[in-house]
Amino acid sequence: MNWTELSLKKYNEIKDLYLDPDLSDEDRLLYQIRILFDVDPLKLKTNELRNYIDKMKFLGEKVPKVKLKSTYKLGENVYVLKKDLRNLTVAQWLDFQNFLKDGGGDSDNYANLLSVFFFPKGETEYGENYDIEQVRSDINNYLSIAEAMSISSFFLLYRKISLRLFLLYTKKQILKTPLTKEQKKKVKKEFRKLIIATLFPGD
C-alpha cells in the first residue's frame, strides 16, 4: 500500500488516531492495521503482524503530489473534474467559500470542497439532476489522499492567484478616482482588510 492507494476516509481515520491522547502507541498501531488492511490484528500471528507493519512504512513518507486528471472513476461512478474557476457559477463559488470558512483546507473538509468541482459524467449543472451527497461519499471513500491533497492545493492556489489579480485591478481602479489624501488612506486601509478577509477566510 502507498499514499496513492489510501482513501481520504481511511487517511482521516488514521489521523484521528494520532489526535487521540488516550491511545497508547500499541493500540494506535493495531487500529492502523485494522483500518488499512481490514483485518483483525488480534488474530494475526507475529510474523503476519511484522509483514503488515512493514507495509505501513509509507506512512512515514511525504504524501506525493500527483497530476490532476480530467476524469476520475470513484467506485461505480465516473466524475469529470471542472478545473477552470472562470466557469464557476455563483452557487459553486458561494459553496466553495462557505466550505472554506467552515473547515478551511483541512482533510476532513476535502469531500465538501471537492464536491463543488466533481460532476457526474454527462451532467453540466451544479447540484442539478444528481445527488451531491453521493458525490461527497464517493470522494471520501474512493479518492486517494494523494489525489485529494493535490486537487485541493490546485484550487486553493488558483483561487488565491485569481483573487489577487482581481483585487489588484480593483485597487488600481479605486485609486484612479479623485479622492483627498485622507480618503485614499482610508480606502487603502479598508482594502487591506478586504484582501485579508477574502484570501484567508476564517482567520
Task: Walk through the language-model features, giving the residues of each.
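Charged interaction scaffolds used for protein-protein
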Residues: 1-203
